Amino acid sequence: MEDRETHLGTREVNETSPDLLKNTPSNIARLEDVIEQCHGRQKYLAQTRSPSDGSDVRWYFCKVPLAENELAASVPRTDVVGKSEYFRFGMRDSLAIEASFLQREDELLSLWWKEYAECSEGPKLQVNSKKKSIETPSEASVSSSLYEVEEERVGVPVKGGLYEVDLVRRHCFPVYWNGDNRRVLRGHWFARKGGLDWLPIPETVSEQLEVAYRNKVWRRRSFQPSGLFAARIDLQGSSLGLHALFTGEDDTWEAWLNVDPSGFSGIVGYTGNGIKLRRGYAGSYSPKPTQEELRQQKEEEMDDYCSQVPVRHLVFMVHGIGQKGEKSNLVDDVGNFRQITAALAERHLTSHQLSTQRVLFIPCQWRKGLKLSGEAAVDKCTLDGVRRFREMLSATVHDVLYYMSPIYCQAIIDSVSKQLNRLYLKFLKRNPDYVGKISIYGHSLGSVLSYDILCHQHNLSSPFPMDSVYKKFFPDEESPPTPAKADKPCSSHPSSNFEPEKSDQLNNPEKITGQDNNTMAKEPTVLEHHDVIQEDPSLISDSVVANVGLERRGGQEDDHHDSSGAISSQDVPDGADCRTPDSPSCSQEQSWDKESVNSNNEERIKLLQDEVNSLRSKVAQLLSENARILSDEKAKTSVAPKELNNEKVQTEDADAPTSFTPFIKYQKLEFKVDTFFAVGSPLGVFLALRNIRLGIGKGKDYWEEENAIEEMPACRRMFNIFHPYDPVAYRVEPLVCKEYLPERPVIIPYHRGGKRLHIGLQDFREDFAARSQRIMNHFDSVRTRVLTICQSKSADNLDEMEETDDEKDDRSYGSLMIERLTGTRDGRIDHMLQEKTFEHPYLQAIGAHTNYWRDQDTALFIIKHLYRELPDGPNSPTESTEGDDSPKDSSRPHSWIDRREADYDDEELPLTFSDKQITRSFSAEAKKYLKKP
């Protein structure tokens, strides 16, 4: 396999092969062997039996990200890092980083000391760096060149493949989104500073201590001014007078870090003999670990788990509105969702399922880097009153308006499609053998964008949704070119040049029909319908507007050519058709030859100007006549006069095709989508406004006279998840199957199991009413059947009735579409979260739309679906577990419903019908109590 390369400015350094960068289970054992057998590893092994000696090297990453253009060698600025300033990588991640480091140790150390020297040149460099740091926050956005550099970097994968480590720069950077660089530190020497934790020492001091250790400086001990019999080693660090003291023999040596009395010992906290040192990592021996230590331990365990279990399912998280705001961060939202799903999976899934598959959630940021030209104009028009509130609306609600605009819709669709393909190719580059599934999680507007992209994977070109509205008001107009023939979408910007040949083709429909597909894909005009307009005067109002725009555009273009003197003989070839057959100069133009054209340019320009003036006069006559006709037709007075009286329509030539025949060009995704999750989605109202139903195009009779357009997303399954109080969410099932309109959405199980008390009571009442109605219907059917048998003289009527019943049992078109979208005969699309027992609907509606990222019920529902095809154990059959309230593994303490003994301090304990054992026990006790005299 080809070696990967890491770009280091202008210099390239060969990296290890991709299989060496994977933290797979089979790779970890190999990494351990590589580390043990590596020649560079031998010098880091323990050479003594002292308690202060060890060989365990651990890698750390800084909690605070580096500033832009800040070198890693400049931090930390202390000789011992502070507590909680650096976090440890997991054991397996550290092994992978150390193995890669040892393979290129000499080169990496050389580059590191060179960078350290650049940081130590003097105060001049510090002033420049400070000036840069001051200028950086004033910039509106991060430089695009920085992102280009980030794209080229490939390092050692850590933390489940979401981050990578660049050993040359000592950076830890995110892989799938643009984020900050974090300082990476190699912990070989550690110090105990006032507590029980061993904190790492920066590499600059650690390397000096390592040289002293290999030389066994404790053998050259002498009496120090303090009276201590030790060997002193002066160190170069951030503190003046920094030195180390080594005492003891070979197997009992100890070391302390200290500074001279003239130094800043009071600032850095040196007391007595100094800070105790040790070589090699040692864990904490605190009997009561703090919350920070517990979180660190949990994160290390999760990183080790991610390095062992392969990714079998990839989920792209597409955000909705609001990501343009300063406080909005999709990466943090997806990070919270990832932590919640990991905790729920540990409690609700079996060990076999957890060890077989891992789900990777990757954020898809399509709005951060997207700059729309209309945003600047909106900012200029924004009033000063309640400025903050208006800015909040501009960062949230305006995204919906931009997407509904025919001008910016294409840019938004391109941003989402390109981002999805970019993320997938990034993942595939690092996992070339990936054969798992891929799903899309779309929140809010992101679900609408994802749906539109999935619906146009086979037909990549589609009219803008507003085009159907135009056809509704102008049914007699010829439809725009079919998407299959449209090679590219119509531009949303006015054209600066109008070619004479194109103008000639637009005025001659016969020439257009003889052209190739490229010519057919050009923008249609109403001039092609000249004959139809003559037969039906009522259509003049629709055609003359575009005619005016085209004629005015041609006139302006002629003026442009006249003033620039750019017209040549190629502009009007021999035998070319005249612009208008009634023009007085038509016969003259046909009789011209090349010599006369080249010699009489001025005369030809004059004739063209006369022709333009005559055309303008004819247009004015048509406008006046058309205005008289429109005054008699009341049906079109609400639409046509606004366009006829607007002179800007005549001058802005590109507005007509952009407003009425816009086309959206969709990019084909590089992957197949397994499941599409629409969460908190307004998709239902978008489809209703477009008059779209979900189908395969054969439901005309099913939808009767609704004249609906049908489309089907390219995915195996689709789910619509929403909170009942979310003001943005809408149902989807009524647009798929009419019979599902009275059906309630499926209740998503509570993450502790079952349904809440009020939900259970409500379902009990509805189920009781439904069953009672079915019983009554059954009695009515039996009575009708008995009466029919008694009244009939033969069994023919009975056979006919049975055939009629069989016909009634046939499934409808909508139910077939439900099965196509869900994968099961009785599947459902709409799934509703349970509201809390005591909460106000209107107060809950404020945060219901943004709470999906932190909702445990939503996370558990998605996790159960993604693991649905995995059996509970190696020999267990595969079962679907969606919405199942039964425990999956009775031998595990963390089952689906057994949650009473769990500790949930951060959440209220609601009343549910989930614990069947407690319910039975309570019923038994109640019966015993009632039996007592």
From Swiss-Prot:
It is found in: Vacuole membrane. Residues 1-14, 553-563, 885-902 have a biased composition (Basic and acidic residues). The keyword Acetylation does not apply. Pfam families: DDHD (PF02862). Residues 593-631 form a coiled coil. Signal peptide: none annotated. One of its GO terms (molecular function) is phospholipase A1 activity. Residues 1-22, 475-517, 553-598, 871-903 are annotated as: Disordered. Its EC number is 3.1.1.-. Residues 505-517 have a biased composition (Polar residues). Its main location: membrane. InterPro entries: AB_hydrolase_fold (IPR029058), DDHD_dom (IPR004177). GO terms for cellular component: plant-type vacuole membrane; plasmodesma; vacuole. Expressed in roots, hypocotyls, leaves, stems and floral buds, and, at low levels, in siliques. Keywords: Coiled coil, Hydrolase, Lipid degradation, Lipid metabolism, Membrane, Vacuole. The keyword Mitochondrion does not apply. Forms oligomers. This is Phospholipase SGR2. It comes from Arabidopsis thaliana. The gene is SGR2.
